């Protein structure tokens, strides 16, 4: 399939058929689940850009951000990259009217960096060889989505950070 051709460089051991077995049951149940999600009240819709940026910095610091090894910047589209075993960089963005966008993008991109920092870079000859490289793009993305969706969107996390989003 066209999907498999495009996915092979990133996920060589996965097939469209294998993914359909995994996702078809979810596809059937997802509409009912989404219908149960309450609408937001927009309480934080006008959070100033400077506060959004500060909250993202506070988040990084609470998760062990080290400005000697890490760099955070602002860009049009969030991304992360590792330039060496002690050089992790992420960018985030601020979107007017979407106060959680910067915070969640920061959580996601920092998740990529945390995964990279957990690779065995301290082993001889690990970087930039396969031993010191991510298993796959899917595993890499799963780790960043874990921090964004399972941690930063959790009820306990919301309780901890709620006051920062209220003016």
Regions found by a protein language model. Give the residues of each.
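Long, amphipathic alpha-helical stalk/connector segments used for oligomerization, subunit docking
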Residues: 151-167
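NAD(P)-dependent dehydrogenase/reductase Rossmann-like domain
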Residues: 110, 129-130
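Glycine/charged-rich beta-loop-alpha catalytic/anionic-binding loops adjacent to active sites
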Residues: 88-92, 123-128
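Active-site metal-coordination segments of metallo-dependent hydrolases
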Residues: 130-141
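Contiguous, non-catalytic segments that form substrate-binding/exosite surfaces or channel walls
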Residues: 1-100
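Generic, well-ordered alpha-helical scaffold segments in large soluble proteins
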Residues: 29, 33-36, 58-62, 106-113, ...
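Active-site recognition of the HExxH zinc-binding catalytic motif
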Residues: 94, 99-124, 141-145
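A glycine-rich phosphate-binding loop feature that marks nucleotide/adenosyl-phosphate handling sites
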Residues: 75-78, 134, 161-166
């Amino acid at each position: 399939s066209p999907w498999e051709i495009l996915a092979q460089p990133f996920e060589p051991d996965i097939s469209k058929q294998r993914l359909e077995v995994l996702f078809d049951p979810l596809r059937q149940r997802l509409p009912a689940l989404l219908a149960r999600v309450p609408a937001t009240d927009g309480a934080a819709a006008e959070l100033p850009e400077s506060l959004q940026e500060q909250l993202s910095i506070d988040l990084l610091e609470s998760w062990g951000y080290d400005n000697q090894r890490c760099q955070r910047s602002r860009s049009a589209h969030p991304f992360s990259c590792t330039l060496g075993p002690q050089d992790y960089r992420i960018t985030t963005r601020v979107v007017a009217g979407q106060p959680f966008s910067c915070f969640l993008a920061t959580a996601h991109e920092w998740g990529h960096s945390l995964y990279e920092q957990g690779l065995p870079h301290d082993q001889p000859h690990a970087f930039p060889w396969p031993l010191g490289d991510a298993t796959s793009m899917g595993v890499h993305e799963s780790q960043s989505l874990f921090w964004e969706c399972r941690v930063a969107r959790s009820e306990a996390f919301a309780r901890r950070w709620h006051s920062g989003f209220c003016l």
